[in-house]
Structures are given as C-alpha cells and as structure tokens.
Design a protein with these regions (language model features):
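Conserved MFS/SLC helix-loop-helix module at the cytosolic interface between two early adjacent transmembrane helices
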Residues: 57-93
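Residue-level signature of mid-helix packing/kink "hotspots" within the transmembrane helices
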Residues: 24, 52-60, 144-145, 260-264, ...
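Juxtamembrane intracellular "pre-TM" segments in multi-pass secondary transporters
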Residues: 1-2, 185-217
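Cytoplasmic membrane-interface "Motif A"-like loop-to-helix N-cap segments
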Residues: 68-78, 275-289
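C-terminal transmembrane helical hairpin of 12-TM major facilitator-type secondary transporters
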Residues: 280-328
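Cytoplasmic helix-loop-helix junction between adjacent transmembrane helices
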Residues: 101-140
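Extracytoplasmic gate region of multi-pass secondary transporters
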Residues: 26-27, 213-264
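A late C-terminal transmembrane helix in Major Facilitator Superfamily
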Residues: 333-370
Length: 397
C-alpha cells in the first residue's frame, strides 16, 4: 500500500468526530432536554439543522482563511468552537440559549472538510484518494456512535448537562494534539491572502459554471446529505414515538449506533472498491437508490415491528445516507484539482449542509402536517431516487 498521511488524517478525522458528537448530542439527548426547557423533542433535535445551516455559510467563506492560516490552524479553531458550544449548552436554561450554543458550533462546523482536504490532498497519492477521504469522513459517524453510546449513560449518571460537559475533555485534548504538529503541515501559506474578500463565495459558485460534470454531483450532495440528517437526527424521536419512552435506550444505543457504525464500515469498504474496481460515481448512484429503499421502509415503522428489523434498516440507511460522503468529497477533490481543493470541497460542504438545513426543517414540518413520519419519508425517497437518476445520466455522458 502506498504511503498514507496517517497523522493529519487521524487528527482531522477526530476533529470532525468531536464536532459531530457535540452536534448530534442535541438530537440524542432531546427527550431529556426538551421537558427541562419546556419545548417538544423535535424542537431540540432540529437545532442540528441550525448547526448545518451556519456550517454551510462557513464552508463558503473559509477557503481564503485556509490558504492564509493553514488547514491545521483552522482545525484548532473548529475544536475551540466545539468547546464553546459544549460550554454554552451545558448551562442552557432556555431554547434560545441552547440555540446560541448551536450557532457557536455552526460558525466553523462547515470548515472541517475544506481544511482537512487542503492538508490531505497534496499528501495523498491519486490511487489512494478515495480510501483516504473515506477514512477522513469516518469522523462523522464516529462522532454519532460516541454520542449514541456515551450520552445515554452520562444522562443516567448526572443528567443531560453532564453529557455536554464531559465532551469538553475531548475537545481540549484535540486542541493540544493538533497544536503540537500544526507547523509541520501548515506550510505554503499565502500570508497576503485577503480573507475578507466577497469574491471567495463567488468563486465557489463559479465552479458550477466552469465544471459541468460537477453539477449532478452537487445536486446529489444536497439531497443525500439532507436525507442523512432526516434519518440520523430523527431516529431517536421517531422510535420514541413508535415504541414510547421505553424505546429510548434501544433507539439511542442500538438503532442510532447501527446507523453510524454502518456508515463507518461502508466508507472504508467503498473507498477501497472505488480506488480499485468501480468508479466512485457509479457507487454514488447505487447508494442513492438504496437510500430510496431505506426511506420507504422507514415510512412504515410500527410498534408491531421487531427491533431487529428496525436495526437492519437503520444500518442500510447508514451505509447509504451516511456512507456516501467520503466518495463524494474525493470526487470534489478530483474535479477541483490541486489548486482548488479547498474551494471544491468548500462547495461540496456548503451544498451538503444547505441540503441538511433545508430538508431537515421541512421534514420536521411534514411530521406535524401529516401527523407522522410516513409521508415525509416517502418524499425523501422520491428526492433521493431523482438525484441518483440525474447522477447516473451525468455519469453516462
């Protein structure tokens, strides 16, 4: 196996894990946070979409900062923002203060992929690109798994506030670890780069005009990521509604972990396959159609269903809606080229996060309008199928 930049790869992966765990704690702990703050479970869970909305904006504005200060320095800033969110959330006395915590994380949440891609792309051989970026993206489901496994016991031990406070240790350790190697990887910085120019976001949008082949991928990134959060952020609330409060521990510690763990294993396997046998584009098409199947099944969840069937479908949702991102980012890196890695992955991140920010609140609204999850999931199925079809047509051309 050709050399893989393991040190920056693992550090950037764990940075993503720390930020994701903090964000997903909002949904995992929502059944306990909501009564304390006098709101509905879904009102807390949808704050994850607030993180992603602000993250989308940060993804579009961060590339100049990456070029000037370096990807590892930005990774430190991400961990600082994560620590700020955890501190604010742990002392929240209202949904407004909790929202402020979500905003403090979101302001740099979208910087994870562009900053790490800027560091990893020049250090990674082309034949290992899909594998490296798939491993890097493991940080997302890893953070979700840590949240699913650790948050419920922490809540039982000391309440939901402890669940946020305990994560501060992880964030602070990451700040120190990245600082130790920052100078080794933050080389070639453009110290004269104007970081406040408005042309940065314009350049990102301009890639859609300059690179026609990126457009179907852009649409798929938007829809697939929206579907990912519709599955991931609402697994706990949906299963609590189906099985009652007694189903909380199954939902958070089994179903949600199955979703995230499947995303981890799939990313690694598909990264190897894409580097050796089947192109990343066709794998992304297949994932879209399987995502559609999983959404249709999720629409029919009922209290008469055995737990094992729910777990299987959660694993399928994780393998597709969560497992696709490594391949997608590798494709954005390939299309952007070495000089526009931060910009191309910034565009990809922004589209993914805008998809989350748009689809998750609409999904939440659909739950209220249709008094359940069935029709919202059927709509998700229609969108993922259409996106996969467009990507397939674009790939054939």
């Amino acid at each position: 196996m050709q050399k893989i930049p393991w040190t920056p790869l693992l550090l950037t992966m764990l940075t993503q894990a720390a930020a994701t765990m903090a964000a997903y704690t909002l949904s995992t702990a929502s059944p306990y946070i909501a009564p304390d703050l006098g709101v509905e479970n879904e009102d807390v869970a949808q704050l994850v979409a607030v993180v992603y909305l602000l993250g989308a904006m940060s993804a579009m504005t961060v590339p100049p900062f990456i070029h000037r200060f370096g990807g590892m320095t930005i990774s430190i800033a991400i961990c600082v923002a994560t620590a700020a969110m955890l501190s604010i959330a742990s002392f929240a006395s209202s949904i407004g203060i909790l929202t402020l915590g979500a905003l403090s994380l979101g302001v740099l949440y979208g910087s994870t992929a562009p900053s790490s891609s800027h560091v990893l792309a020049p250090l990674t051989a082309e034949k290992r690109r899909n594998f490296v970026f798939s491993v890097r993206q493991i940080g997302v489901p890893l953070g979700g798994i840590l949240g699913g496994l650790l948050v419920p016991p922490l809540i039982l031990i000391g309440g939901w506030r402890i669940a946020f406070q305990a994560q501060l240790i992880f964030a602070l350790v990451m700040i120190f670890a990245i600082f130790l190697v920052r100078s080794r990887y933050d080389h070639g910085r453009d110290r004269n780069r104007n970081v406040w120019s408005l042309t940065g976001p314009i350049r990102l949008v301009g890639l859609l005009r300059e690179l026609p082949e990126i457009r179907p991928l852009a649409i798929a990134a938007f829809v697939y990521s929206g579907a990912q959060l519709c599955f991931g952020a609402f697994i706990v609330t949906q299963l609590v509604r189906v099985y009652g409060q007694d189903g909380y521990h199954f939902a958070s510690a089994v179903a949600l972990v199955a979703f995230q763990l499947s995303g981890i294993t799939t990313r690694i396997v598909l990264g190897v396959i894409a580097d050796s046998w089947i192109s990343a584009r066709w794998l992304l098409v297949a994932q879209g159609f399987l995502m559609t199947l999983s959404a249709i099944v999720a629409a029919g969840y009922d209290s008469s269903w055995p737990y094992w069937l729910i777990v299987i479908n959660c694993a399928l949702a994780g393998a597709t809606a969560s497992g696709y991102t490594g391949l997608a980012f590798a494709e954005f890196v390939r299309m952007g080229g070495p000089k526009r890695t931060a910009e191309a992955t910034g565009l990809g991140t922004a589209l993914m996060f805008f998809g989350v920010a748009a689809m998750a609140p609409l999904f939440r609204l659909g739950i209220d309008i249709f008094n359940g999850y069935a029709i919202p999931y059927f709509l998700v199925a229609a969108l993922t199928a259409a996106s996969a079809l467009l990507l397939a047509i674009g790939t054939r051309r």
